[in-house]
Regions:
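Juxtamembrane/interface segments at transmembrane-helix termini
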Residues: 404-420, 483-490
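Short, well-ordered alpha-helical packing segments
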Residues: 336-339, 469, 485
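Bacterial N-terminal signal peptides
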Residues: 2-14
Length: 490
């Protein structure tokens, strides 16, 4: 065991040394007194078919291996070096490994339409001017670990058949991956972007943007994520659009931070869209989206943030009503879809709250007419069928107010019955004014049964008030039973 403990650090260091892109030191750590090699000598050596193996050199002049050149069949390894002139290798096929790790490119670099049949290694490189990899074909793994692009760069229409690793890479200016195809896995873990575009890009395998930072505009419009995608803990400083994109697997946006509007209009999530603990400082636009299941547990919204669910089709939308109640862009169909969603989740109280707000906003926006008057009655009497307390209040209020009226207005008399004489017998004698308790008892009897107690009766105009209370009693009691049944029986 002691021997194993001593050997373990050595074995780990050797294993890390074999990871692509991690075995080359930073260019800054190398000596500045590097030998100078002319670009023409490099071209001549490539033409001779001899393998190239240089480290810590300076390549002077323009290195131009243009179209029409036969496939480069030998391996090329130029690491931790500096290219002072332009590097132009267009429509060139590299049959063996191309290893340019740790190099600094002081001028423009172009690998347009190149084919890399084996590994293409650009880890820890620094492109000070434009870098163009448009229409490039990577048949093997492509590693850009900790690579820095200080100017505009392009990977448009590029195809990555092997793993594409942009771990810890930095893009200090515009970069586009428009129409690119990632047929295996892709990693942009902890990458830093300014303006970036993945328009109509295809990710056939798993891809991660975990902890990536998007400081400029980020465009993922019409992008196809055919497998799982990870944006966990990513941060978007400016506008981000995923409009018309499709997600075929798990879409993990947990702990993400959108500081501006997050546009997901027209997207399609075929699997779980996980946004737990996300933060939205701007609006969340899901208009026209198709969601299989979207989870928004513990999300945080800015005070001015809005959520647009217009024309959104979702099977399961997991977010508590208290989180979004003041942020919904009003749309009747969206509200009713949320009500149905909450009922499917068996969150019945939240379904009631959502429906109540839907009706209240509709009432505020409706023009005056019989329809609005009917809505007002429905609101005040039973809270649109989801507020039992409203109906209970009106029952108690009606009993109390009529009791006060009968008592204060002396609207009822009471008989004192001597012996066991029947009502209407001559020995029945009217008594003095009834007490408030008797008036309240009389009001309860009229409200619940429309019949006065045997020893009391209304007088004068109060007969009509007693009849009106009986009618209101039947109305409110019937309404109470209906609303209570709807709330208790789900």
């Amino acid at each position: 065991m002691l021997l194993l403990a001593l050997l373990l650090p050595i074995l780990l260091s050797e294993a890390l040394a074999e990871v692509p892109g991690l075995d080359s030191p930073s260019p800054a750590s190398r000596s500045q007194a590097a030998p100078v090699i002319a670009a023409q000598d490099i071209l001549a050596q490539i033409g001779s078919g001899e393998p190239l193996n240089y480290d810590n050199v300076t390549v002077a002049g323009q290195l131009d291996l243009g179209p029409g050149v036969l496939p480069v069949k030998q391996s090329i390894r130029i690491t931790n070096s500096r290219f002072q002139g332009p590097l132009r290798m267009e429509a060139v096929t590299f049959a063996e490994i191309l290893d340019l790790r740790g190099c600094v490119y002081e001028d423009d670099v172009s690998f347009v339409k190149c084919v890399f049949q084996k590994d293409a290694k650009f880890s820890r490189a620094r492109f000070q001017k434009q870098a163009d990899f448009a229409e490039t074909y990577f048949q093997g793994p492509a590693s850009f670990i900790s690579t820095l692009f200080q100017n505009d760069s392009s990977f448009s229409n590029a195809q990555f058949n092997g793993d594409a690793v942009f771990l810890d890479s930095g893009f200090a200016s515009d970069v586009d991956f428009n129409y690119a195809r990632f047929l295996s896995s892709g990693s942009f873990w902890n990458a830093n972007f300014e303006d970036v575009s993945f328009f109509e890009t295809r990710f056939a395998g798993q891809v991660t943007f975990r902890a990536a930072k998007f400081r400029g505009n980020a465009t993922f419009a019409a992008t196809r994520f055919e497998s799982d995608v990870l944006f966990r803990a990513a941060r978007f400083w400016r506008g981000s659009t995923f409009g018309l994109s499709s997600f075929g697997g798990l879409a993990d946006f947990g702990n993400i931070n959108f500081q501006k509007t997050a546009f997901f209009g027209g997207v399609k999530f075929a699997d779980l869209a996980y946004f737990a603990n996300a933060r939205f400082d701007g609006d969340l636009i899901l208009e026209g989206a198709r969601l299989y299941s979207m989870q928004l547990d513990n999300v945080t919204f800015n005070e001015s943030s809005k959520i647009n669910l217009n024309s959104t089709d979702f099977s399961k939308f997991v977010v508590h009503w208290s989180t979004i109640r003041d942020r919904m862009v009003y749309n009747g169909a969206a509200y009713l879809a949320l009500v149905k969603n909450y009922k499917n989740l068996e969150w019945f109280d939240e379904a009631d709250e959502c429906y109540y707000q839907y009706r209240r906003i509709g009432l505020d926006q409706a023009p005056w007419g019989w329809g609005k008057i009917s809505d007002i009655i429905s609101w005040l009497s039973c809270g649109y069928g989801v507020r039992v307390s409203y109906t209970a209040f009106w029952c108690l209020f009606t009993i109390l107010i009529f009791g006060v009226i009968f008592w204060a207005g002396k609207g009822m008399n009471k008989f004192e019955i001597e012996g066991v004489e029947l009502p209407g017998y001559q020995r029945l004698k009217p008594s003095k004014r009834v007490s408030f308790t008797d008036a309240l008892y009389f009001s309860i009897a009229m409200f619940t049964t429309s019949q006065a107690p045997v020893n009391t009766y209304p007088v004068g105009v109060y007969k009509h008030l007693a009849m009106a209370e009986g009618i209101l009693g039947w109305f409110f009691l019937g309404l109470f039973v209906v609303v209570l049944s709807a709330v208790l029986i789900r």
